[in-house]
Amino acid sequence: ALAGGLEVALTCDLLVAAEDAKIGIREVKVGLFAAGGALLRLPRRVPYSIAMEMALTGQPITADQAKNHGLVSRVTEKDGTVEAAMELAESIAENAPLAVAASKALIQAQQGITEEEFWELQKPHMMKVFTSNDAKEGPASFAEKRSPNWSGT
């Protein structure tokens, strides 16, 4: 994902990259800067110095470098990205919907708030998730050695 492609990719929670992928913001090479969000989102996903180097040099990084910096969660063989992304999606979909939604919301919200603010923000999510039917179904299915039947309620 280069330039605008990376800016779109950075809006995603999870990224899967092929082993031969090049990832970068090359706009400075043509007299522009990455105005579609990469300068905001990239430093939130990789170390500051890596984001700065990518933005100022226009040089892309490899998929393995992106994984090492935490930008992508999985690197696959050249033609394996769709399959790996589907496996990741299926793995997420196997879990309780309310718990997944709360986890995602809290991880997204934690940036820029204090620890005290986070604990307050978490309280309504705890009330909703920990009192849900899914919170009962999870331990019951575990005890009964069966797959859970999530209701999302």
Residue spans of the language-model regions?
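Short beta-strand->loop
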Residues: 113-119
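Crotonase-fold acyl-CoA enzyme core
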Residues: 1-100, 131-132, 136-140, 146
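Intrinsically disordered, low-complexity regions enriched in Ser/Pro/Gly/Gln/His and often acidic
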Residues: 112, 142-143
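Short C-terminal tail/terminal secondary-structure segment
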Residues: 147-153
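Helix-loop "lid/cap" segments that line or gate small-molecule binding pockets
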Residues: 54-55, 106-110, 125-130
